[in-house]
């Protein structure tokens, strides 16, 4: 099982709606998470790579105060997978998207893979 799948399953086990990218469509009618591959980097000539994983937190327009609550809840859940996955400390500011009538912020995590995993 991949790290992505472990994080996805851990969030889902805690009764939070979670989706892979480009699956949830339309307006934000309830709180949910999108789990997104944030890319990879390789240091120098080493074969290991650092993989970034973005947790995108969405809440409806009228539930702005839920944004930080849901974000904190998800961070506590994902932090339970440490040291498999580690927070980078990067979080975006809240952003309102009129096209989906919802608020979003993201929390970034990282993990390391060997070779071309």
Tell me the role of every PLM-derived stretch.
Residues 27-36:
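Short, well-ordered secondary-structure micro-motifs within conserved domains or adaptor modules
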